[in-house]
Amino acid sequence: MRIKICGITKLDQGQAIAEIGATALGFICVPKSPRYITPENIKNIIQKLPINIDKIGVFVNPKIDLLSEIITNTQLNGIQLHGDESPEFCNQLRHSIPNNIEIIKALRIKSPQDLKKANIYENYIDTLLLDAYHPEKLGGTGKTLDWKIIEEFHPTSPWLLAGGLTPENVTKAIQKFILVSQTQIESNHKFNHNFCGIDLSSGVETAPGDKNLVKVRKLFSSLATLTMKK
């Protein structure tokens, strides 16, 4: 299962979170965000991270040429689109960047109708991410996604669950998508509906961009106690 911690701004925290067990770190490339980090600082952090951890840049309605430049300069190996990017944009982007760069498209879910957008994007992206809808903010709001809405979500693409996840509620959320019993969170779990992992930001923070390592460790302790359905 993928465990992505988003909103990394500090080298020591990024290294510690990777050591604790995260499989992916997210870097916010949106200047207006309180979690914004410059491409230069992203590069400095990435150079000191383990090779096997995914490094994802988060963008909102980016220009493709600027995005491509940031990917090249920072060595990100994935990008997350968290704005109003169209399927046509995603298709153009797919043909403009290397095939080994993962494209994640975030969808902000307010009602079951919003899930229908997933089918439109799946041909052009690698992974979907479901986040809670907020009328003013695009992400990192701490608002919990209504899990009932996505119980019948059956995409063909892998997808990540976000939206107000915390060490306290994460196991309850994940239980809805577990297919096969395992004993350790590090094992290769089997999930239904192509659920592939979780994405947290505010749920493991002291303040925007300042990760709380106590909360991160508590998250992994919670995941380790996960009782898997048969």
Curated annotation (Swiss-Prot):
Keywords linked to the UniProt accession: Amino-acid biosynthesis, Aromatic amino acid biosynthesis, Isomerase, Tryptophan biosynthesis
Superkingdom field: Bacteria
Entry EC number(s): 5.3.1.24
Pathway annotation from the record: Amino-acid biosynthesis; L-tryptophan biosynthesis; L-tryptophan from chorismate: step 3/5
One Pfam family here: PRAI
GO BP: L-tryptophan biosynthetic process
Keyword Isomerase found: yes
Xref: InterPro entries: Aldolase_TIM (IPR013785), PRAI_dom (IPR001240), RibuloseP-bd_barrel (IPR011060), TrpF_fam (IPR044643)
Residues making up the signal peptide according to the UniProt record: none
Sample GO molecular function, one term: phosphoribosylanthranilate isomerase activity
Chemical reaction(s) catalysed: N-(5-phospho-beta-D-ribosyl)anthranilate = 1-(2-carboxyphenylamino)-1-deoxy-D-ribulose 5-phosphate
Stated family: Belongs to the TrpF family.
NCBIfam families: PRK01222.1-4 (NF002298)
The protein, known as: N-(5'-phosphoribosyl)anthranilate isomerase
Species assigned in the record: Trichodesmium erythraeum (strain IMS101)
Protein encoded by which gene: trpF
